[in-house]
UniProtKB/Swiss-Prot annotation:
Presence of the UniProt keyword Cell membrane in the record: yes
Protein name: Putative dicarboxylate transporter subunit
Pfam families the record matches: DctM (PF06808)
Transmembrane segments: 24-44, 55-75, 91-111, 113-133, 139-159, 178-198
Taxonomic placement: Bacteria, Pseudomonadati, Pseudomonadota, Alphaproteobacteria, Rhodobacterales
Single GO cellular component term: plasma membrane
Main localization, broad class: membrane
Keyword Coiled coil carried by entry: no
Originating organism: Paracoccus pantotrophus
Gene that this polypeptide is encoded by: dctM
């Protein structure tokens, strides 16, 4: 099983396959290993896994469809103009980062990360990269929008993780301590840029 990690990371780093293709390779490797090495995986188990994956995929796609529709409403109502207003304030770097965090957190509550990146990053990036490192800004955007996956009203992960349809509400009730810890980590990432920039600097150093 540990070879799966080596296979995925090595294949991506070596340019053998893309991250999307790596997921297919991982599934194939897991099926072959379970069936022929551990000998605990039957055709009935495979069909059950496919069925559970299909049900989960349908649930996620329905959430994404609703989120995209709501994203269109937000765009029509002027959310991009809110980003322009933040830029027009001419804030200090610290105040700007706090405003960007707030904007992205609210935006991420109603939309999945990809549309959020496509809509807000082109507006904020030119101003942000003039004040902070590009890697730092990218991490802040990704972390903020990812938090939206576990916060109502959309919260895609809230509906993906539970197996029982009644569990999302119970999951939401258990969230506050973890969400506070996530907010603390976000503030640390925001005000300690080295945590966001050291790995890219090492990885791409010549």
């Amino acid at each position: 099983a540990l070879l799966l990690i080596v296979l995925i990371v090595g294949g991506i780093r070596g340019g053998v396959f893309t991250p999307t293709e790596a997921s297919v390779v991982a599934v194939f490797y897991a099926i072959v290993t379970s069936a022929f090495v551990y000998r605990g995986f039957t055709l009935a188990d495979l069909w059950g896994a496919f069925l559970r994956s299909a049900i989960m995929s349908v649930a996620v796609l329905m959430i994404l469809a609703a989120a995209r529709a709501f994203a269109w409403v937000l765009i029509i109502e002027g959310v991009p103009q809110m980003a322009d207003a933040v830029i027009a304030m001419d804030l200090s770097p610290i105040a700007f980062l706090l405003m960007v965090n707030l904007l992205l957190l609210v935006f991420g509550m109603f939309m999945d990360p990809l549309p959020g990146v496509m809509i807000l990053v082109p507006i904020l990036a030119p101003f942000a990269t003039a004040r902070i490192a590009r890697d730092h800004f990218a991490i802040i955007v990704i972390v903020n929008l990812t938090f939206g996956l576990m916060t109502p009203p959309v919260g895609g992960l809230i509906f993906v993780v539970p197996r029982d349809p009644a569990e999302p509400s119970a999951l939401i009730r258990e969230q506050p301590p973890f969400f506070l810890a996530a907010m603390a980590s976000l503030l640390i990432l925001t005000f300690v840029p080295a945590l966001s920039t050291w790995l890219p600097q090492i990885s791409f150093a010549r």
